[in-house]
Curated annotation (Swiss-Prot):
Cytoplasmic side: 1-15, 70-82, 129-132, 188-232, 291-298, 424-442, 490-536
Family from the record: Belongs to the major facilitator superfamily. Sugar transporter (TC 2.A.1.1) family. Glucose transporter subfamily.
Source organism: Mus musculus (Mouse)
Alphabetic keyword roster: Cytoplasm, Membrane, Sugar transport, Transmembrane, Transmembrane helix, Transport
Name this protein carries in UniProt: Solute carrier family 2, facilitated glucose transporter member 10
Gene: Slc2a10
Subcellular localization, as worded in the UniProt entry: Endomembrane system; Cytoplasm, Perinuclear region
Gene Ontology MF terms in the entry: D-glucose transmembrane transporter activity; dehydroascorbic acid transmembrane transporter activity
Amino acid sequence: MGLRPAVLLLCASVSLLGGLTFGYELAVISGALLPLQLNFGLSCLEQELLVGSLLLGALLASLVGGFLIDCYGRRRAILGSNAVLLAGSLILGLASSLPWLLLGRLSVGFAISLSSMACCIYVSELVGPRQRGVLVSLYEVGITVGILFSYGLNYVLAGSPWGWRHMFGWAAAPALLQSLSLFLLPAGAEGTAAPKDLIPLQGRETSKPGLVKPQYSFLDLFRAQDGMWSRTVVGLGLVLFQQLTGQPNVLYYASTIFRSVGFHGGSSAVLASVGLGTVKVAATLVATGLVDRAGRRVLLLFGCALMALSVSGIGLVSFAVSLDSGPSCLATSNASQQVDLPGSSGLLVRSSLPPVLHTNGDQGQLVLSVTERPIHPVITASLGPVLNTASPVPTSPILEHTLLCWSALVCMMVYVSAFSVGFGPVTWLVLSEIYPAEIRGRAFAFCSSFNWAANLFISLSFLDLIGAIGLAWTFLLYGLTAVLGLAFIYLLVPETKGQSLAEIEQQFQTSRFPLNFGHRQRIGIQYHRLDVSSAS
């Protein structure tokens, strides 16, 4: 027991460093894309392929990663993903042509997606119920810290001739440190040595030796046996509502709102984005501290309700403020991306430019549209939807206009914080708890693939949705979706706070319909307490 604090610290480092690598790789392309375009003369389509190749690799990993995690174990999957990431970073750092860049990005995307699934499962199985929420949520904290770290590094290396090579190479550092931590930890809950290894950490939560474990196939996820269908409904519902509430798109308009309230110029916009990222890190830290105290359901309900109010507020402000949007994509652009992955954070990813360059727009997104336009030598547009706020504002309503813009900024800050408290960290924590160990990797990967697919769908449909119903109604639609998500969480998502994985397993096996989860949870805890008191 004397080694327990050290082991818990190693578990925390695995979760935090895994998230840091994930967040850094998501954000690094925002600072590297412009120098890559200048060095390789990338066209608009080539830039979109370069940005989207990471998403493609991540989607591939979500399709096959579950089988790798269940067959070879969680720790081996993480170590293997780190090896792929190191290879991808090396390819990117030494790349001399677009195909090598695409191969490197594809490899990195595969690695971070596989690692994100394996890390959450590995840590959730390795520690007891009292530490599980905090340690798994540290992965989300790592993502936000990694993105902030990429902001600073991109800003420092923006003027360096080969700065983009160093940007890609720095991702190897947290991956190497995580691998070192893994070598000092047990293999995990699977394998013959697992009960002996986990005794110091989980105590009575470990499986009894000699107990015959059930075998599950992938199709069992859709059957009623052992409550598997209920688990699948809960898992898919959480990942889909995480995306359908508009998280991949809301922050595409962040830089325009920043400019509207006075953040003019490249450096000011970068600092404003860092401020937004700092708010997100703070909210994630709050969620990490509360997840084992307040519970998973409470954070999900609170976060989703706050998201519904804040995104609806952005929509209402959009009715009052004249905002125009239009897709544009030039070969020379200040491109940035915002991608929300497992355990994803939804943080604005913003690139910093050398002082001599000027941009009319600061935000971009993954593949949205390609317009056939001639390449202009001056950077005048950005990837993705851009809000035109350059129209003159009459002198008389200037105060009202300023208040509305600040209201939109506050709503966006609240939205980011609400996501970081609820869907951001808790979704992947719940997914790592509700499935049996024998199929946990495949189930987690199955839900993760829907998360990536929904992210891509929301991103690709954003411009068409705005063209059909307008910007304000688009945000109000996201608010309505958040209300539906609130009802889903209240009715179907169980509370897993303070329960061992075995107790969560029993809860699903004995409940035929998820609507009974809240009542059954209270009864289960009551009997557990009576049993403990009588035993003492």
